[in-house]
Amino acid sequence: MLNAKISVYGALLVLMVISYNTKLSFPSKETETRYKEVLEAEKDCYNYLSELFDKIDFRHHRLSRYDVQSKYYKEIRAKFPLLCSQMVLKAILETVGNWNTCIANNKDSFETPIKKHLSMILDKRLYSKLTNQTIELTVPGFKRVQCSFQCYPQLQKLFELYKPQNCNIFYKNGQFWLTIQFDIPNIEHIDGEALGIDRGIRRIVTCSDGTGWINREFNKERRKLRYLRRCLKAKNTKSSKRHLKKLSRTERNRSKNEVHRVVNWLLAKDYTTFVLEDLSKIKQSTSKKTITVDGQKKEIKRKKHNNRFGQIPLKEIQTTLEYKAPLLGKEVVTVEPAYTSQLDYRALPKGMRLGTRYCASDGELLDADGNAACNIVLRHRPDSIVVKPTYGSMVFSGRPMSTGQSWLQLVQTVATTSSQPLGCA
């Protein structure tokens, strides 16, 4: 089964990395069994280090991986003799990295990280002679073992175009998988117009050129899946938990598919810079509200708001756009999100927002999301060209097409009309 995913490391000027997963086969049952034992030992080593960090209070007294190596390397080698020295170092690197990530994200309120699956990070000391069909792995007790993997057509293209880098290996459902990483050089950014993008709940994206994306069928299906999830959680039986796991996978895949459709629709436009709001802390800042009880102010959770907000793939839209845009010579930038939906993009006195309508101070009725998108792009580039978001004039795509219009026709239509004024109904 083919499983490909793409990830971006560093800023846009740094090389991008494409990761491709393929099935891995060992030459004999003995080597396969031994390598599985190695992965289990590496998992136990990770969990041992994680529990050790908890005892020494790593949360408040951090150690670098070099400090951990100098203090606990001999102890770990003696406790896990099956692991070679480089495997121990990789386990230390992974454990320290995960702990630092947890501390940066949740500070003190996180449980001790525990590794449940079999996987290991490889480097040049743990593998060699990587070709488009074989790889030699270090297997304790067997030295270097030549293993083969399935070279899918897309993987063959990556080998022909790009240089492979480090690999990872993991074990899932009785099968070894090899993750091969390729360095992708960025295309030089092309100077051009900027497009402001406002993300929302019902309207997934609204743009400063008078267009937007809303898929009512997708929203309906998402509400249905959420209702089924609540029903299954209430039953709390073994079969309901199994069904719930399958339902979560379905919801995740459909959301991911919708995100890719939205991003492809955005990239089909004739803009080279996409401006988004920096919503990295939006859930923390809006998850609670202050009310007055008996003359005292009290913070309470906004449960309904949080449940609806958790259904929106805000970060996934940004991440997907950030790795696809540089491949086309385009870029993604973020701006401060404060007051983008409350201020008038024409620099007039502050108006009033009522649902999807924005009542400007001069009596003009604007589309609230369109006004926010204009504020976003003007905050990054004040001389940007925007289309006046008059209420009722926005052109939305992504709805179920009653005329049988295909997705390709829709992209072509948007691409040809994106350079024309879209402010008129």
Regions inferred by a protein language model and the residue ranges of each:
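Short, low-complexity interaction segments enriched in Ser/Thr/Pro/Gly
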Residues: 2-3, 113, 121, 385
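Stable alpha-helical structural segments in soluble proteins, enriched in small hydrophobic residues
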Residues: 45, 49, 87-102, 370-380, ...
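Short amphipathic alpha-helical coiled-coil/interface segments
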Residues: 42, 91-99, 225, 244-251
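N-terminal cationic leader/targeting segments used for protein routing and processing
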Residues: 4-6, 116-117, 389
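Gly/serine-rich nucleotide phosphate-binding loop at the start of the catalytic core
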Residues: 2-93
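Positively charged, helix-rich recognition surfaces that bind polyanionic ligands
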Residues: 15-22, 26, 33, 173-425
